[in-house]
From Swiss-Prot:
Transmembrane segments: 31-51, 60-80, 91-111
Location relative to the cell: Membrane
Organism for this UniProt entry: Bos taurus
Domain of life: Eukaryota
Predominant location: membrane
Name of the protein in question: Transmembrane protein 253
Keyword Phosphoprotein (UniProt): no
Disulfide bridges in this chain: none
Feature: compositional bias, Polar residues: 155-165
Keywords recorded for this protein, A-Z: Membrane, Transmembrane, Transmembrane helix
Keyword match Transmembrane: yes
Disordered, as annotated region: 145-165
């Protein structure tokens, strides 16, 4: 009798394990989707900062890559919250989230490519104030090179030592 009870217990244990696996399989897909979106957001923000460093005068170029990064971050957070939602919301929300995640990823790539295109097409006089400051620094450096006192400085010091001797 105990053998029969043990045999009946085993299938129910297997069934329970399969049900547990089926419940968490969808949750695992959501977790992978959330992590990929969070990584996209983390990767896009430094790109936006580097674009800003290349051309600080054009704010549009700086703001373009930040949009997909922020949207990817929000999608990742919503996806993590969706893992705790009831099953009905998971089924409908999963499809919407997968499509929106793909759209955000594609949007991030397109916007980043467009911002690089804008950087490559910028005119040389786009940042005129920066180039003027650079020219002023160059002129100041050339004035320092022309000062003859730097060459006579050590000789004056050496003659002062001779007079003391």
């Amino acid at each position: 009798m105990e053998d029969r009870a043990g045999q009946q217990e085993r299938p129910s244990l297997r069934l329970e394990k399969l049900q547990h696996w089926a419940r968490h399989r969808q949750s695992g897909r959501l977790l992978v989707l959330a992590v990929s979106q969070l990584w996209l957001a983390v990767a896009v923000v430094p790109f936006a900062v580097s674009v800003a460093c290349l051309n600080s005068a054009c704010h549009m170029t700086t703001a373009l890559p930040l949009g997909p990064g922020i949207l990817g971050l929000l999608t990742g957070i919503v996806t993590l919250e969706l893992r705790r939602a009831p099953r009905l919301w998971k089924l409908a929300g999963l499809l919407v989230l997968e499509l929106s995640a793909e759209a955000f990823t594609l949007g991030g790539v397109l916007v980043s490519a467009y911002s690089l295109f804008l950087l490559s097409q910028r005119k040389p006089r786009c940042c005129r104030s920066q180039s003027l400051r650079y020219q002023e620094l160059q002129e100041g450096l050339s004035e320092l090179e022309e000062v003859p006192e730097l060459e006579t400085g050590p000789t004056v010091a050496s003659t002062a030592k001779r007079t003391n001797q």
